[in-house]
Amino acid sequence: MNNLIIPKDYQSALNLHDTQVGIKTVKDFFQNLLAERLHLLRVSAPLFVDPASGLNDNLNGVERPVVFGIKEQNEAQAEIVHSLAKWKRYALQKYGFSYGEGLYTDMSAIRRDELTDNIHSIYVDQWDWEKIISREERSIDFLQETVRSVYKVLRKTEKYMAIRYDYIEEILPHDIFFITTQELEDMYPGTTPKEREYLIAKEKGAVCLMQIGDLLKSGEKHDGRAPDYDDWALNADIIVYYPVLDISLELSSMGIRVDKDAMISQLDKAGCPERAELPFQKAIINDELPLTIGGGIGQSRICMFFLRKAHIGEVQSSLWPEDVTKAALENGIQLL
C-alpha cells in the first residue's frame, strides 16, 4: 500500500453510475476526434499473438507476458499482448493502407509484472494507432507536428468535458512544451528521471519529452524502450501535470518507427541482435513494411484525467492488493 496516494479530503464528484456515463462520454468524443484529425480507421486487433512471430511488445525486455496453451493446436503457445506497437505496422501492410492513411484499435493487454499504484494497473487499455509516412517525414519536425495534433485533441476533449460537467475546469495550457531527455537532464542535474518529469510538468503544464531509450551523458537511460519499434531519436511521451495527485502523468507514448538502419543499431545497443531473425524484424530489414509513425494513448488514464479521479481503478475494472482496496474505500476512492 506504500504506492497509494490519497488526496486530502478527496471525494469523487460522480457516483458509480455517472462515472460510467462520463467514461463513455470521454472515450466517444476523444477517439472520434483523434481518428478525424489523424485520418485513422478503426480496425479489429488481436488479444494474443504467436510468440515466434516477434509481434509482441517486449517493453523493457524483462516483463513476462501471460502465456497459455491452445488445446486444439497441440498446446501451441500464445502470448497475451503487452501492446500492439509492432502488430499495427504489420497490419497496415496486410490491410492495404496507403501513404497518409492509418489505423487505430481498442487494445486490451495484461502486464502481469506491473507495479500498481494510482496510475498503473496490470490491465492496460489504450488506443493504439499507426499511420504510413514518407522517408522525408522521418524527422523531428514531423514528430512535433503530429504531437501538436494529438495535443489539440486532448485540449478539445477537456473543453468539451468542462462544458458538460460543472466541476471540471480547464487546466491544460494552450501549447505543449517540447524538450529532449538530454536537455531535461542538463536542466535538473542530480535528479532521477521521474523527478525531472514532475518538475518540468508542474512548471509547464504539458510537456512533450523526446528521444527516449538511448543512453544520456550521465550513462543512464531516461527510460527503457524496446529496440525494434520506436526510433529512439524520433520518439516522445506526452506528459501533463495532474493536480489531483500532484504528479506528472504520461497520457501518450508515441514515435516514428525504426527503419532498417535504426533497428539494426538499436538491437545491437540493446544486446539482442539475434532478434533481427524474427519474422517482423526481418521484414523491416528487407524493407517489406511501410515507414510509419504511431503511438498508444491510455484510455483509462485519459478518463481518469478528464473526470478528475484519484485512482485509475475508479475508471477501469482490475485486481488490486486487498489493503489498497480497503484503504481506498476508507478514503472516498471507490474502485470498480
Predicted stretch roles:
Residues 101-103, 124-128, 204-206, 246-248:
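Extracellular structured ligand-interaction cores
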Residues 34-41, 150-161, 310:
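A generic secondary-structure signal for well-formed alpha-helical elements
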Residues 105-191, 195:
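Extended, charged alpha-beta segments that form solvent-exposed binding/catalytic grooves
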Residues 108-110, 180-336:
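A translation/RNA-centric and nucleic-acid-associated enzymatic feature enriched
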Residues 18-25, 29, 138-145, 279, ...:
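Generic recognition of stable, solvent-exposed alpha-helical segments in well-folded globular domains
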